[in-house]
From Swiss-Prot:
Similarity remark: Belongs to the alkaline ceramidase family.
Protein name stated in the entry: Alkaline ceramidase TOD1
Residue numbers on the Lumenal membrane side: 40-462
Function: Endoplasmic reticulum ceramidase that catalyzes the hydrolysis of ceramides into sphingosine and free fatty acids at alkaline pH (e.g. pH 9.5). Inactive on phytoceramide. Involved in the regulation of turgor pressure in guard cells and pollen tubes.
Any one annotated GO CC term: Golgi apparatus
Keywords: Abscisic acid signaling pathway, Glycoprotein, Golgi apparatus, Hydrolase, Lipid metabolism, Membrane, Transferase, Transmembrane, Transmembrane helix
Gene Ontology molecular function terms on file: hydrolase activity; transferase activity
Cell compartment(s), UniProt: Golgi apparatus membrane
Knockout consequences: Increased turgor in pollen tubes associated with altered and delayed pollen tubes growth. Short siliques resulting from severe sterility. Insensitivity to abscisic acid (ABA)-induced stomatal closure in guard cells. These phenotypes are partially restored by the disruption of GAUT13.
Keyword Aminoacyl-tRNA synthetase recorded: no
PANTHER family: ALKALINE CERAMIDASE TOD1 (PTHR12956:SF13), ALKALINE CERAMIDASE-RELATED (PTHR12956)
Length: 462
């Protein structure tokens, strides 16, 4: 008997080709979707090529310290103005060449002498009289009318630094956090300095971040710790003491050609050499600073400062704004371009030290001493009125959120260990209590009819 033989017919060639096309289309679509999702969070950051990051941890913190607690989320996943980083080794070579080159012959000359305050406490007219710096032989006020209490050994090391990343923690207000993404040669080229006071040092002792039997040359990972001794030469307000290294960094590090100021509430996530190169060297500017995420006009920031009780002396804020209005403060408009805004986020400041950026920093410090340490309020007035003009790269908020991580300030602080510190803390608390009892905002003070900022407010509100 014959057998039935069953055969399976293969699909025709055109059908197999269509199946292959669909498979490839699915594969490439999946890869594209994966890359898009992976990179969409980082669209502001583009690297030319890989570099060799440091693999080992810079510092191992005790678990009680909590250096990564309370990170603030970012709100922007896209970027209208991305930043491009060149090859690490090319950048390293170029920055080292700049650092080894000769310094400019023209330098600022500073007023020396002694005064009742660290900054000299100059009058309004006197401060503003220095804004037009057309004669390089004229000495300008720039702090240091009292000694800054650092040790001689620290001072010697600070004078050797050619590129510095600096920060400060006073009154145990923040945590020390290590920079991330450093190249293998960065620590040989860049100095990291953290200025702290006694209260912050006691907190570091308490958490065993620094051991008490260590020498006075303290280090925490990348950071060299500079203890600012308690002194009558400084200010009662810890925030004002933090302003000294923030705005007089060119005087504390006189041989530094570049600097990056990092508020202690943020953690640097990109190698500082790449930041300096992409934000200062390539665009050929004096400073780089982020735009404020919400405000464009100085008066908006002033009102928010009063509204959210960021500074308790509302009368002082009103006097400051009226002083600036009387001397020509204007709301932002296209006539101020290439400056895209009047309000920065000053948590991250990059500087190429020179006459223009140093003048701006000096005059900013003078205004902060005269009024308050809220540096966003004086920013536009100083920037718009000084001569020579400072060249600024005011980059997008999205970039800021990619190059740093922001954290909340310390929610719980270590108790002061000495009677003197406790007494000082009680004085500060009494001052804060008095400020809280006041009305946070006197609408009459900001009235269009009574304020010298009437024209400013009319132009701002339309």
């Amino acid at each position: 008997m014959g057998k039935f033989i069953t055969t399976t017919l293969s699909p025709p060639l055109y059908a197999r080709s269509k199946l292959l096309c669909f498979s490839l289309l699915y594969l490439f679509s999946t890869i594209f979707l994966f890359l898009y999702v992976s990179l969409s969070r980082n669209q502001c950051i583009f690297r030319y090529s890989p570099f060799d990051p440091i693999q080992a941890k810079l510092f191992s913190y005790p678990s009680s310290y909590g250096e990564h607690k309370y990170a603030l989320p970012t709100h922007r996943s896209s970027c209208s103005s991305p930043i491009f980083f060149s090859d690490y080794w090319t950048v390293l070579k170029e920055i080292q060449s700049i650092l080894s080159g000769s310094s400019p012959k023209e330098n600022l000359r500073y007023i020396n002498g002694k005064s009742e305050s660290f900054g000299g406490n100059f009058s309004t007219q006197k401060r503003f009289s220095y804004f037009n710096h057309s004669n390089i032989d004229v000495e300008v006020p720039c702090g240091f009318f009292r000694d800054f209490p650092v040790s001689n050994s620290d001072r010697v090391e600070m004078e050797k630094c050619g590129l510095v990343v600096a920060s400060a923690i006073f009154n145990d207000h923040d945590k020390i956090r290590q920079p991330v993404g450093l190249g293998v040669k960065t620590l040989e080229t860049v100095c990291f300095y953290m200025f702290i006071d006694d209260k912050t040092l006691n907190s570091l002792f308490h958490h065993n971040v620094i051991l008490k039997n260590n020498p006075s040359d303290y280090r925490v990972g990348a950071w060299r710790i500079i203890k600012i001794s308690k002194s009558e030469n400084l200010y009662l307000n810890p925030a004002m003491n933090g302003v000294i290294p923030k705005y007089l960094i060119h005087r504390l590090f006189p041989n530094s050609k570049f600097s990056i100021w990092v508020d202690a509430k943020i953690q640097l996530m990109i190698d500082p050499l790449l930041l300096i190169h992409s934000m200062l060297v390539v665009p050929e500017v004096d400073m780089a600073i982020s735009k404020h995420p919400f405000f464009v006009n100085t008066m908006e920031e002033a009102m928010a400062t009063a509204r959210w009780k960021k500074w308790g002396d509302v009368d002082g804020l009103r006097i400051q704004m009226e002083t600036y209005c009387e001397h020509g403060l204007k709301p932002w408009s296209s006539s101020k371009l290439p400056y895209p805004t009047d309000v920065p986020d000053t948590a991250l400041i990059l500087r190429r030290h020179g006459i223009r950026s140093n003048l701006f920093s000096c005059f900013m410090f003078n205004e902060l001493e005269a009024f308050n340490p809220r540096d966003q309020l004086a920013f536009a007035f100083v920037r718009d009125h000084i001569n020579p003009k400072v060249k600024m790269n005011m980059f997008e908020v999205e970039v800021f959120e990619q190059v740093v991580v922001e954290y909340r300030h310390n929610l719980k602080k270590i108790e002061s260990s000495t009677y003197e510190e406790q007494e000082e803390e009680q004085k500060q608390e009494s001052l804060r209590t008095i400020q809280k009892r006041r009305k946070w905002l006197d609408h009459e003070s900001w009235s269009l009819n009574r304020s010298s900022c009437k024209n400013y407010l009319t132009d701002m509100w339309g």
